Design a protein with these regions (language model features):
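Cys-dependent protein tyrosine phosphatase-like superfamily
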Residues: 1-93, 104-146
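Short cysteine clusters
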Residues: 96
Length: 146
């Protein structure tokens, strides 16, 4: 997606890191919880170590799905993720394990910084991105700035 003279990528966990740097992506936001240990797609503790030498900035703002966050917890964490999306150098890639939580974070960015109504941002994230989790859809629809 492009907007505000920036390019954004919303995706599942990258399987290789050199293509990210080679594509000119400047920043990566991971919204995975470092405690995710489920194989074959566990949290990659080497991600920052692989991206930084490629001159790609990296940060992690977890949106955990187990245990489920309260609406207030979601609002705070999604807001923090949206701040990163809004302020870090583009092009920016945001990811989680499957793209679902990354899509929720991007929807909150659209609400918070692009002026989208909650329902429109949630619909975009469901139809154009990978938002599918019913709880995250509800939390995007009910999002308010913390």
């Amino acid at each position: 997606m492009t907007g505000n003279n920036s390019t954004y990528y919303v995706t599942a966990q990258p399987t290789a890191y050199p293509p990210i740097g080679n594509a000119g992506i400047a920043s990566v936001l991971c919204v995975r919880d470092p405690s995710e240990t489920t194989q074959p797609n566990a949290f990659d503790i080497t991600e920052a170590d692989n991206l930084i030498p490629q001159h790609v900035s990296y940060t992690n703002v977890p949106l955990p799905h187990v245990p489920a966050m309260t609406q207030g917890q979601f609002n705070m964490q999604a807001y923090n993720a949206a701040v990163v999306i809004n302020s870090w150098a583009p092009p920016l890639l945001v990811h989680c394990s499957t793209g679902d939580r990354a899509s929720a974070a991007f929807a909150v960015f659209m609400i918070q910084f692009c002026g989208w109504p909650n329902a429109d941002a949630a619909d975009f994230a469901q139809t154009k991105l990978a938002l599918a989790n019913a709880l995250f859809i509800q939390q995007v629809n009910n999002y308010t700035q913390p």
